[in-house]
Amino acid sequence: MPERTHPSPIPALLSWTGIALCVVGLVAHRMWQELPFPRAFEHGLLALLALAAAWPLQRWRQWSRAAALGAAWLLALAVFSGPMPVLATALLAAAAIGVGSLVLRGPIALPIGLAMIAGTLGWLLSLPIHHRAVYALACIAVVAWRRRAILDALRGAWHTFDAGVRASPAAATGALLLLGLASTAAWLPTMQSDDVAYHLGLPSQLQATARYAMDARLQVWALAPWNGDVLQGVAQVLAGGEARGAMNALWLIVAAGAMHGLAGALGGDATRRWWAVALMASLPLTMHLAAGMQTELVAMAWLPALAWLVLRDDGTSSPRSVLAGALLFGALCGLKPMHGVVALPMLAWAAWRHRAHLPWRALPVGALLAAICGG
């Protein structure tokens, strides 16, 4: 009889060693003296309020606690960020799923579609066509045209979420609680210096003049990469006002979904997938990014989506996967060249992993799409 093989304990040992070293560092450097206890109290109070708001849905609608928490956080977002920004962002997200599903179907269509929209509109910024009616009609037309693909993607996302919650309800609840706490930064008005001095310029110009003045004499950063600000501009024009909070909440959702999928592609069970989401949401930098318009929040969504694409086919590849990866890589370059540099090892990893099934004929088209999205 063949000998039974046991998984190596080294990966788990490395993971738990990192946690142990973190605890040792906290004690050795007396980090509790630097902890912002008033902020921790505020977060604890918000968590209790969210659980209380979710309780009626659990009690009378028999929703899972994680799903009820998600609904409570979304309702709070609509209250504090405004219903119009949330509706505008939802319309943009639906249109992104519609166009992204032309490349790959399923929830992955959302980050791909956002990359396609940003890459396309980036070439049209100087034209006076960025009116609210134009954006609304374009999004509604895409939603009407691709409604079946959009509904399929939403069903797939819900089934994945529901299955994950049923498999590990406690971990799912913890992850949704932390993700919701991170999203509270999206309730705040835009007030970080970089955002007020630069990032708000593009969305505000699109809303006020229907075009973007790419003139470095007016703003020294006017010709800097702008993919993230373009999507902020679409949401702001559709909403008729600032929509940063709702758009950042969308990026948090995309990042959480990508991290959940990536952890699964790496072999994690349901609990570890939710742990990956919780880890991402609990990083202090995540909340800081959700309060502003920095490119790192967008990269936090697109990079794990690209990594998931590399892993998804278990050693095989397809032309559509190559095109999807090219779109995401180009979008990262158009976000900030640094993010493209960070993604380069993933491209090398993808080439090695899929070397036996690499669709060479799709590579020139992929390179062209990456140049369009990142140019």
How would you name each of these model-derived features?
Residues 1-162:
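Membrane-embedded, hydrophobic transmembrane alpha-helices
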Residues 65, 69, 106-112, 242-243, ...:
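Transmembrane-helix signature of polytopic, membrane-embedded enzymes
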Residues 104, 306-322, 350:
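Membrane-interface transmembrane helices that cradle and orient dolichyl/undecaprenyl
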Residues 120-125, 310, 321-337, 346-347, ...:
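Membrane-interface alpha helices of multi-pass inner-membrane proteins
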Residues 134-138, 323-324, 337-352:
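Transmembrane-embedded, aromatic-rich helix segments that form part
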Residues 163, 342-371:
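Perimembrane helix-loop-helix junctions
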Residues 276, 312-330, 360-364:
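Short hydrophobic alpha-helices at membrane interfaces in multi-pass membrane enzymes
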Residues 288-298:
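Short acidic/glycine- and proline-prone juxtamembrane loop motifs at membrane-interface regions
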